[in-house]
Amino acid sequence: QRIFGENYVQEGVRKIQYFRDAQPQAEFEWHFIGPLQSNKSRLVAEHFDWVQSIDRLKIARRLSEQRPSSMPALNVLIEVNIDDEETKSGVAPDDLLAIVKEVAVLPNLKLRGLMCIPSAQADEAQSRAAFAKMKSLFEFCRKEGFDFDTLSMGMSADFALAIDQGATMVRVGSAIFGARDYSNR
């Protein structure tokens, strides 16, 4: 395993620094996959290789401005609120093309594709429909001329279904590491 995703900025930065010090030759790739607040964007821009959760132009602009010029462009994915859930972050499907056009031209960022997290209450048919809709949005953006290569969707409980619907990246932390223990956070 060399690709790791983190939901929490400070926890992720601690792990990144630990592994860079402990194994400087190792080629780990670090993905930030959680919601990102403006006040933590600099840490993400300076430490992570990917951000899978771009949900606002403001965050994309901050990451672009804060990415050190000595580092490669930050790989980013636009998070889509595919089920239109009020409690979830993400761009509405109808607003997707507008933000894609803006983010694609920002310096220091490389827009690689899209990410979604379907409703936790969705049954298999609903998840399949959400993943199929995401694949359709992904292909639409490609037809509009964007060089997307990454469709991140599916987690431990539904990754096989996501792959079946076209995911190129899945997030399977709990399937590998077990359920997260929040008692000592």
Language-model-detected regions and their locations in the chain:
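Conserved alpha/beta-domain cores
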Residues: 1-157, 165
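Expand to "…catalyze enediolate/carbanion chemistry for C-C bond making/breaking, isomerization
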Residues: 161-164, 172, 176-183
